[in-house]
Amino acid sequence: EGLLYQASGLHPDGEMLVVSGQTVTCEEYLRWVDYACQYISSRIPDVDWNEQVSEDGMTYGEYVKVEAVETVKQYAVIRAWAQQENVTLSDTDKAQLAAQRQQYVDYYGSEEAYLQQLALVGISDEGNNATLEVQYLYRDLYQSFCTPGSSLYPDDKTLSDYADQQGYVSLYVLKLNGENAETMAADILERWQAAEDKEAEYALLCDELQLTADGIVTLASAEGDALSDAMTALEVGEMASVIDPYGEGSCFVMLRTDTDLAAVAETYFDTLFEQKLEAASVVTNSKLYDSLDVGAFFEKLTQLRTEMMEAMQSTDTPTGTADDTADDAAGTTETPPAE
């Protein structure tokens, strides 16, 4: 049943958690327990998993278990969100997943060799594919949510209200440096104010000053920041110069525009994801969860992995370190960008 099962005694298909209605199997959970153990042990050689690491008495082993819960919670919440919004893998997604898998098969030389690498990680081909699929679902949710005109794109009122709550402003900004920055700022402000086509004048000024034309930038206000205070004080269509707000010699010339709601949608998506994570219901199979001794599990897993690698090397099967295998054969060890 695989190395994770042999090291833990927990069947891969066992239900370790239910997060927002999504089942998290022992295989999925133990994968991230292993990952957290590898991370900590790489930085703290000979770590004592029973050593306390916090004032409330949490040990390294308990910390690993909690971190693994937080990781699988992210994946489960994405699955639940996608299901709620009827977001499924597109044909393009499936083709990309298949191509990604084939790259690893080609790298290791055969289907059999690739599956051996997954076995070294301790996960099944199906389990690995399921993890990768969630990352595509996250991307699809994000793109649909943040693309104007798409089915999940929020209405303007929702985004406007959110922008107001967070203090978002959108502006064209020119940053000037050098000894003559203050004089230049005054001249540019006067010229820009006189121009009929403000956007075209911005592009022309960027070209003349050899500045990157970033276009409209959307920023959240920062209380007590001199430049931010000046930005938020502007009305839409109003312009101003800000002289050396940070005492470093830089000056800014700004034109406030209507808030770029598409830019706001991106941060609103992140906020919603965080809210869903915080609100997620987590039901733990206490019998399975409490039975896991992280120190014993990782020690046994390391031993089994070493033995398997030695056997694979004796038959000339390409191998790397356990960490290399987790990163390469399994496609990724990255979690969705939730934090």
Q: What are the roles of these predicted feature ranges?
A:
Residues 1-62, 66, 229, 233, ...:
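Short, low-structural-confidence N-terminal segments
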Residues 11-19, 167-173, 247-248:
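Extracytoplasmic
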Residues 27, 59-76, 88-95, 127-136, ...:
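Soluble non-cytosolic domains of exported or imported proteins
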Residues 50-59, 79, 89-110, 210:
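Acidic helix-start/capping segments at beta-turn-to-alpha-helix junctions
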Residues 129, 136-172, 179:
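Acidic/polar surface patches and capping/hinge elements
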Residues 187-227:
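Peptidyl-prolyl cis-trans isomerase
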Residues 242-271, 275:
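C-terminal soluble interaction/assembly domains
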